[in-house]
Curated annotation (Swiss-Prot):
Pathway: Steroid metabolism. Belongs to the short-chain dehydrogenases/reductases (SDR) family. It is found in: Microsome; Endoplasmic reticulum. Its EC number is 1.1.1.-. The active site is at Y232. This is 11-beta-hydroxysteroid dehydrogenase type 2. CDD domains: type2_17beta_HSD-like_SDR_c.
Length: 405
């Protein structure tokens, strides 16, 4: 009988020894991830036996097994104890659900809301413990930010401030960048970038003292050019770069910075169809006549319909995002980036590794597929469509007025 090659035997003994130690410490996640890791190691073993000399095969297998078991280790969590966390944008969505979870875990939660009598604020006041404090704050108003900073400093003297969750976000328009008013870009930057910047800088003395955490909710739209999200995506790209800068600069102070890049989720603001309809009508009412003539009302109606259709694929369970925020606050070694949601791995692979044309087609198929603006449609008087636009297979003819209505 053929003997088992010694590199395989030695490597599997090392893997088994480490797995046993992790099991004794209850530090190994069982289930399908473990089975998948073992299957991959077995396949790697087969390849190493045929392609590598025994010493190299032993080294590769042992290293792969060590890395796999490290990835399967249960994440070490810090105790909650009396830690205090400030969360912005708790009227609804991720902020509200995160505030509820952290309060149930024993955190002292300072939750900011736009309105103290909003439905989300009333829900938090009803279902959470007396430890949770609601604070009114509009990130576009420096006076509100100053008041929250003073309150936080005064009410965390005994516990210190462990974490800041920059969750509040803002988007007004889903349209081409040329169609989006400059005021929309400014308002997105005010909330998503400057508001987070001012609040973070104001709380850094407390966070440096506690060697705490900064968690910011970003968006994949800040990493890749989502169609019709120019204002929102630009602000999210800016805040992501800012947080990466903070991450490097605050490392000597022991402050860890994480960014959450969630997929498409059905938060209250996203699924409010009436709100998006009002914003579309406001955009049409204020659009310069020249742009309205060039693009056409049907074009904007088409974008709006595509956007609402894409929301049907959004996830209604916000738990993955809440869990990511919680892990960033309590993990002994939090990640720099979290990507909760479905399909993000494929999206980022396509964005980083495939040609630009394929990236553009994928984003249009996934989110919003453009039609031709009115001025580029065949038969329009006085207009000759550019050659590249006429030949672009991603652009479909504009919908007829009957379909748009």
């Amino acid at each position: 009988m053929e003997r088992w090659p010694w590199p395989s035997g030695g490597a599997w003994l090392l893997v088994a020894a480490r797995a046993l130690l992790q099991l004794l410490r209850s530090d190994l996640r069982l289930g399908r991830p473990l089975l998948a890791a073992l299957a991959l190691l077995a396949a790697l073993d087969w390849l190493c036996q045929r392609l590598l000399p025994p010493p190299a095969a032993l080294a590769v297998l042992a290293a792969a097994g060590w890395i796999a078991l490290s990835r399967l280790a249960r994440p070490q969590r810090l105790p909650v104890a009396t830690r205090a966390v400030l969360i912005t944008g708790c009227d609804s969505g991720f902020g509200k659900e995160t505030a509820k979870k952290l309060d149930s875990m024993g955190f002292t939660v300072l939750a900011t809301v736009l309105e103290l009598n909003s439905p989300g604020a009333i829900e938090l006041r009803t279902c959470c413990s007396p430890r949770l404090r609601l604070l009114q704050m509009d990130l576009t108003k420096p006076g509100d930010i100053s008041r929250v900073l003073e309150f936080t400093k005064a009410h965390t003297t005994s516990t210190g401030l462990w974490g800041l969750v920059n969750n509040a976000g803002h988007n007004e328009v889903v349209a081409d960048a040329e169609l989006s008013p400059v005021a929309t870009f400014r308002s997105c930057m005010e909330v998503n970038f400057f508001g987070a910047l001012e609040l973070t800088k104001g709380l850094l003395p407390l966070l440096r003292s506690s060697r705490g955490r900064i968690v910011t909710v970003g968006s994949p739209a800040g990493d890749m050019p989502y169609p019709c999200l120019g204002a929102y995506g630009t602000s999210k790209a800016a805040v992501a770069l800012l947080m990466d800068t903070f991450s490097c600069e605050l490392l000597p102070w022991g402050v860890k910075v994480s960014i959450i890049q969630p997929g498409c989720f059905k938060t209250e603001s996203v699924r409010n169809v009436g709100q998006w309809e009002k914003r579309k009508q406001l955009l049409l009412a204020n659009l310069p006549q020249e742009l309205l003539q060039a693009y056409g009302k049907d074009y904007i109606e088409h974008l709006h319909g595509q956007f609402l259709h894409s929301l049907r694929l959004a996830m209604s369970d916000l738990t993955p995002v809440v869990d990511a925020i919680t892990d960033a606050l309590l993990a002994a070694r939090p990640r720099r980036r979290y990507y909760p949601g479905q399909g993000l791995g494929l999206m980022y692979f396509i964005h980083y590794y495939l040609p630009e044309g394929l990236r553009r087609r994928f984003l249009q198929a996934f989110f919003i597929s453009h039609c031709l603006p009115r001025a580029l449609q065949p038969g329009q008087p006085g207009t000759t469509p550019p050659q590249d636009a006429a030949q672009d297979p991603n652009l479909s003819p504009g919908p007829s007025p009957a379909v748009a209505r």
